[in-house]
């Protein structure tokens, strides 16, 4: 029986010793970390904005608008702050020099007190964050084909172009078609399409030959006669 009691007392003593040790180890990282102590003392996040920043002394307009802004906000609770600032600026310009003079005197007094309290003060305005412009352009595949429609004589005709050169030629063709009366629209479109295919496939003769065999050139029937026929 005494052996059992002694073992129980030993276990209780060990647990009592372990509990404070666990508590100390759990709080030691917080007390030993200088960053956490700095945040607790300053009440900020450790950056410059968390430190005590010295404010500029108020000028005459700020001294005058301090009470006027509160009055306008109470009279017009729905008015935004930007609108209140515009109204106060307009009212300040309408004041005479005699009406402004007491506020200039108060501003000079505040500036003198500020110089005595902060003799090494230097005004350092905050830099505005510049917006990041993304100059990244989406890559256009060379094999991608864009289709558009040409409106000629109140009819829509599909047209295909592959690159910027073809697009520029296509825009010139649209100007020509819109300025002049269209004559044989189908013939013009086929010739333009055949020209763009031949220019886009200029670097590969095998592919060009395949396209030429698949799409033979278009010859008007009026110009084709027996004298123009070729017999091998």
Curated annotation (Swiss-Prot):
Transcriptional regulator that controls a genetic switch in male development. It is necessary and sufficient for initiating male sex determination by directing the development of supporting cell precursors (pre-Sertoli cells) as Sertoli rather than granulosa cells. Involved in different aspects of gene regulation including promoter activation or repression. Binds to the DNA consensus sequence 5'-[AT]AACAA[AT]-3'. SRY HMG box recognizes DNA by partial intercalation in the minor groove and promotes DNA bending. Also involved in pre-mRNA splicing. Its main location: nucleus. Residues 24-53 are annotated as: Disordered. GO terms for biological process: cell differentiation; male sex determination; sex differentiation. PROSITE patterns: HMG_BOX_2 (PS50118). Belongs to the SRY family. It is found in: Nucleus speckle; Cytoplasm; Nucleus. Pfam families: HMG_box. It comes from Phoca largha (Spotted seal). Transmembrane segments: none annotated. InterPro entries: HMG_box_dom (IPR009071), HMG_box_dom_sf (IPR036910), SRY (IPR017253), SRY-related_HMG-box_TF-like (IPR050140). One of its GO terms (cellular component) is nuclear speck. Keywords: Activator, Calmodulin-binding, Cytoplasm, Differentiation, DNA-binding, Nucleus, Sexual differentiation, Transcription, Transcription regulation. Interacts with CALM, EP300, HDAC3, KPNB1, ZNF208 isoform KRAB-O, PARP1, SLC9A3R2 and WT1. The interaction with EP300 modulates its DNA-binding activity. The interaction with KPNB1 is sensitive to dissociation by Ran in the GTP-bound form. Interaction with PARP1 impaired its DNA-binding activity. Residues 54-122 bind DNA. This is Sex-determining region Y protein. One of its GO terms (molecular function) is RNA polymerase II cis-regulatory region sequence-specific DNA binding.
């Amino acid at each position: 029986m005494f052996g059992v009691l002694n073992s129980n007392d030993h276990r209780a003593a060990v647990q009592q010793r372990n509990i404070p040790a666990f508590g100390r180890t759990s709080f030691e990282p917080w007390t030993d970390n200088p960053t956490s102590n700095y945040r607790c003392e300053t009440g900020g996040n450790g950056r410059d904005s968390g430190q005590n920043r010295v404010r500029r002394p108020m000028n005459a307009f700020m001294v005058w608008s301090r009470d006027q802004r509160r009055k306008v906000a109470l009279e017009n609770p729905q008015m935004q702050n930007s609108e209140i600032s515009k109204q106060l600026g307009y009212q300040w310009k309408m004041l005479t020099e005699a009406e402004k003079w007491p506020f200039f005197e108060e501003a000079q007094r505040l500036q003198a007190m500020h110089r005595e309290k902060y003799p090494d003060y230097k005004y350092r305005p905050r830099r505005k964050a510049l917006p990041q412009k993304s100059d990244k352009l989406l890559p256009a595949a060379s094999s991608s084909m864009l289709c558009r429609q040409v409106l000629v004589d109140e009819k829509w005709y599909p047209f295909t172009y592959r690159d910027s050169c073809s697009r520029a030629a296509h825009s010139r063709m649209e100007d020509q078609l819109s300025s002049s009366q269209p004559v044989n629209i189908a013939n013009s479109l086929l010739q333009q399409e055949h020209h763009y295919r031949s220019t886009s496939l200029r670097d590969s003769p095998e592919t060009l030959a395949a396209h030429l065999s698949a799409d033979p050139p278009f010859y008007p029937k009026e110009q084709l006669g027996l004298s123009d026929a070729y017999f091998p």
